[in-house]
Amino acid sequence: MAPQANQDLQHGAFRQYLPDLSTPRFTTIAQNDAYGHARELKDKHAPPWLHGLYVHWRKLFEEPFKGITNDGVVRPGLFKLRDEGVPIERIVAAAQAVVGQLTPAQASKTILHIDSPEWRSWSNPEFLLSDKGIRLDEIAPSLRDGVLAVLRETLSPEGYDKAVGAMRINHFLGELVNARRVMNEHSYNFVLFGAAPSTTRPWGFSFYGHHLCLSVFLYKTQIVVSPWFTGAEPNLIDAGPYKGTHILDVEERLGLRLMQSLSAETQDKARVYRLMKDPAMPKGRWNHDDQRQLCGAYRDNRVVPYEGVTVSSLGAEQQGLVVQIIEQYLLYLPARARALRLEDVKAVFDETYFSWIGGSGDDDAFYFRIQSPVIIVEFDHHSGVFLTNGEPAKFHIHTVLRTPNAGDYGWALRGQIDGALNQDYVWEG
């Protein structure tokens, strides 16, 4: 069977894992909106493992931002101001149109200081853990369309399509489990950072919700889309008006192809754990919600040591596959910015590591990470959260991109912008 045909069968297998909607978990979520659902976690500590993670996240949030590193030391001088050809005038016009529609109450929750720590309070679970900004399923259609126009003008066309695909799949999941008021195509929050959208001063926005979280920093014609999280459960819509929508399959196919192309000896070096939940993993290497991923929500200062094999030690074919994988992870960026970032990544291939967890057969679930001083990308097959598969399956995927060494949220660029860090911001609390 052709690999892609096999992949399509694997992604479509989710229907055998649909949950029993008569159980208390699903009868409760069916009655709740986003705020009631969040109270289940915050007040009733349900589920307890996610509440425990949430408490840990809030402790991490209290730390000053430093950035992800491989050894605890931020490496300076990796990121420079430059012209990336971003259509800043169009992006600003779209954002100004949104600002013009906000009520005073909406504006007070939506327009935050450029240095607000709330940049870092995004998260992937469907629980609304950080209620800031405007929520798309609660606002007027014209304002919602305006927010989507900001995304459309900011992202590449293919990146925008990917984001919309994630949102539509989230809606599909909400229909599958009768949780439409918690998970739908517009169950996402939008927040602006900066005094005002500007063609000459730094600003940005956060767009976040279940399985799609984008952090966007803009300065003149330069853009940073990092960190971001994109996931799907399932990653394929097999019925309804958006039947055939699928995401994250290219990354999956390329990652497996790369691992399978390595010699047995090199595979052994790349594979840091043989099992997806391996007894050899140290405490904290796996948790119920992040599972194998290290660089998700609130992990802004994590130390992630290099593992696996260096990309520079691989052959030309394998290095080409690494480039193709990175291109998929840079898909949200407009074309010129993407090309420049890709050159940044290729320039440090001698410091870039590829690592793997799990099997590498056509039917195996797996995790991989590509990590360097300038980029971290993670791919992870997950067990069910709403679906009932107890083991990781190919139809539930989480992906993350980070820019280490203070590159996230455009932080490494801010000190290079005149006056950007000379603020009189009064920190709350």
Where are these regions (language model features)?
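A cross-kingdom marker for long, charged
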Residues: 2-156, 161-429
